[in-house]
Amino acid sequence: MSDEYQSVKQELKALLADRKELEDKLDKLQQEIYDKESEYFDVDGGSKSYHNILRGFDGMSRTQSNNSNMTNNDRIFSLSSASYVKQVQDQ
C-alpha cells in the first residue's frame, strides 16, 4: 500500500476518534441540560407548587398547591436539540 493511502487512513482514524469524542461530550451536555430541567421542575424539592417561567406564576399566592405534573412538552431546552430528540426516540 502506498504511503499516501496510509497517511489518509491514519487521518481518517484520527478524525473518527475526534468525532466520537465530540459526540460523547454532546451526549453528556444534553444529559446535563435534561437533569437541570428536571431539577427546575422538581415539584418535591422545596416548594410544593408548580409555578415556573413556563407555566406562569398566576395563583402563586394561593394556599392550595398546584399538583400539575411536568410533561415532556415542558422541556423546551432538551427538545430544542434534534440529536437529543432522535436519541430518545431510538431508545
Curated annotation (Swiss-Prot):
Keywords: Chromatin regulator, Coiled coil, DNA damage, DNA repair, Nucleus, Transcription, Transcription regulation
GO cellular component, one term: NuA3a histone acetyltransferase complex
Gene Ontology biological-process annotations: chromatin organization; DNA repair
Coiled-coil segments: 1-43
Location within or outside the cell: Nucleus
Pfam families: NuA4 (PF09340)
Function: Component of the NuA4 histone acetyltransferase complex which is involved in transcriptional activation of selected genes principally by acetylation of nucleosomal histone H4 and H2A. The NuA4 complex is also involved in DNA repair.
The protein's assembly and partners: Component of the NuA4 histone acetyltransferase complex.
Homology family: Belongs to the EAF6 family.
Name this polypeptide is given: Chromatin modification-related protein EAF6
Upper taxonomic lineage: Eukaryota, Fungi, Dikarya, Ascomycota, Saccharomycotina
Encoding gene per record: EAF6
